[in-house]
Regions:
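A beta-strand edge to alpha-helix "cap/lid" segment located at domain peripheries
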Residues: 2-13, 70, 74-148
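Short charge-dense sequence patches
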Residues: 16-29, 63-69, 124, 128-129
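Short, low-complexity N-terminal intrinsically disordered segments enriched in polar/charged residues
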Residues: 1-39, 43, 144-148
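A solvent-exposed, acidic/Ser-Thr-rich amphipathic alpha-helical stretch
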Residues: 15, 34-38, 42-96
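Generic alpha-helix detector with strongest preference for long hydrophobic helices that associate
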Residues: 6, 18-22, 50-54, 99, ...
Length: 148
């Protein structure tokens, strides 16, 4: 097995657990499918994002397990700002960890900029997910655009 990270271009479907999560996660998010998103996570998954305190009125940005993650995905589906787009060019993986960027510059304008970093378990479910925000995305939070 090659432990070196691999860069992959997006294809029409996913044949490995990494590809399945990469395509299914983006698809569920773009359709505001909170249940579809949650189904990609292990029951005891850990999710971290600056959006957690913003939408759930919590001090911590860390959620543990489906019971804590579900309310975030429900609110995210209902409140996602229109500036949220889904342009990306591929991902990096070592077979267990999955990393991709939603870059600010899409070539057709700006979108909210994130890096999604996930670790999958042996069942191919997301065990740990950290979302890192770029400056354009942080400005969306500062302007309170998720509370529409």
């Amino acid at each position: 097995m090659n432990d070196r990270p691999t860069s992959m271009r997006a294809s029409a479907s996913g044949s490995t657990p990494i590809e399945r999560v990469y395509f299914a996660w983006d698809d569920a998010l773009s359709r505001n499918d909170a249940g579809g998103l949650l189904a990609l996570y292990a029951e005891d998954a850990v999710f971290e994002s600056p959006l957690v305190p913003q939408l759930l009125d919590r001090e911590s940005g860390v959620l543990r397990g489906h019971d804590e993650i579900r309310p975030l995905f429900d609110k995210l589906a209902a409140r996602k700002p229109p500036v949220r787009q889904y342009y990306r060019t591929g991902y990096f993986t070592d077979g267990k960890r999955l990393l991709w960027e939603y870059p600010r510059d899409t070539g057709r304008g700006d979108q909210m900029d994130f890096v999604e970093a996930m670790e999958l378990n042996e069942q191919g479910l997301i065990q740990r997910h950290c979302v890192y925000w770029g400056w354009f995305g942080v400005r969306v939070l500062q302007r309170d655009e998720y509370h529409r």
